[in-house]
């Protein structure tokens, strides 16, 4: 039922990792949260590219795919990984949220920082779509990236160690 779907989604989002990045005891820029997408990446991609939230899609960009067809391209990459025996785990993609304090950055700089962050984290191996949402009082980036690499077909490993690496990279940028 509809309620069960909401509860299931809520449980998945709670299982995501999140933390405010700190340096020398003081809070700085980004608040990070990552969680797996296990059921459908199309709905998540539609949500993050919503024109009402992204300044009419001016704040949407991608790497290795087109934002409009990313779900199909992600799927084709996963199929190739499966054919090569590299499709382990049930994660289709990962959803990363990078939030900034109100007034800390403008939309264009937030988007640029998000792109730099995604490029450094994913090292040109994973397709991704990034969007910057400006519909709330805090500007935030949504980055959805394929769980399977289009270069070597290995799956992205999300654990505490990889999460702390994400925090360090975001902190540096």
Model features per residue range: what roles?
Residues 3-173:
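N-terminal nicking endonuclease/strand-transfer module with a His-rich metal-binding environment
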